[in-house]
Structures are given as structure tokens and as C-alpha cells.
Amino acid sequence: MARDPSTLRYAETHEWVDVQEEGGDKFATIGISAFAVEQLNDLVYMDLPEVGRTLEVGEEFGEVESVKAVSPLYSPVAGEVVAVHTDLPDNLDNLNDDAFDFGWILKVKLSADLPETLMDFAAYQKQCSEAG
């Protein structure tokens, strides 16, 4: 199932969030936006968290490195990491083509509601156009 960027929520730090309910629990799949991938350009390395790690909103959980810069990745949600996209670090070029499907980074079992600071697509596009 392809993710529609217009249905996702976004952090100011360019992570996207796709929330799904499974068996009464809520899970958030998290990745970085196409805008962030474009700005970083030529990705060379990504550091991912371990499954089982507990994250708080705003906590750094990894980093992505390009030939231009090293950028931390921040958790836009609170919860436990239940899955990590282990194929991603070896296939970073695919992020340029598919930041929203292949480009997912981790899946978190939510321990709290989504923060109100997460933006909808229109607000995120506005932030990107002002930054771009």
C-alpha cells in the first residue's frame, strides 16, 4: 500500500508519521520527508536505533549523513521501537525515489497520543517553502 504524503503528519525536523491501529494498539511508522532527502542530497550513511528502545518525543534516535552534513533524526512520537528498516542503510539511494514507502525508518508502538506540534501536509509544505 503506497503512502499518500498528504495524509501523514510531520515534525518541524522533517520526520513524517503514519499512524495505524493494530489489535487495539496504535503504531507509528516514521521516515524522513522527500524535502529533507532533497536538502541533504547524496546520502552516504544512516544510523538506526535498536528494537526495544523506548523513545520520547523530540529524542534523538539516529542520524543521517550526506556528503554535505550529518543530521540527527528525532522521534516525533513517544513509544517503544518495535521494528527497524534494516535494509535502508544499504539502499539510501532509494530514498530519493521513494521517501514515503521504501524510506520508512522505524515503527513505534505508541505510549501516548500524537503531539499537537505535528503538522498536517499543508502546514508542512508551507514550512518547507519558507525554508526553501
UniProtKB/Swiss-Prot annotation:
Span of domain Lipoyl-binding: 27-109
Q: What does the note under cofactor report?
A: Binds 1 lipoyl cofactor covalently.
> Which of the residues bear the PTM N6-lipoyllysine?
68
Q: Which GO terms describe its biological process?
A: glycine decarboxylation via glycine cleavage system
Q: Does the entry annotate any disulfide bonds, and if so which pairs?
A: none
Entries under Pfam families matching the protein: GCV_H
Sorted keywords for this record are: Lipoyl
Task: Kindly list the cofactors needed.
Answer: (R)-lipoate
Write down any Gene Ontology CC term.
cytosol
Task: Please give the superkingdom of this protein's source.
Answer: Bacteria
Which function does this protein serve? The glycine cleavage system catalyzes the degradation of glycine. The H protein shuttles the methylamine group of glycine from the P protein to the T protein.
Tell me the protein family, please: Belongs to the GcvH family.
Describe the protein's quaternary organization and the partners it interacts with: The glycine cleavage system is composed of four proteins: P, T, L and H.
Q: What is this protein called?
A: Glycine cleavage system H protein
Source species taxonomy? Bacteria, Pseudomonadati, Planctomycetota, Planctomycetia, Pirellulales
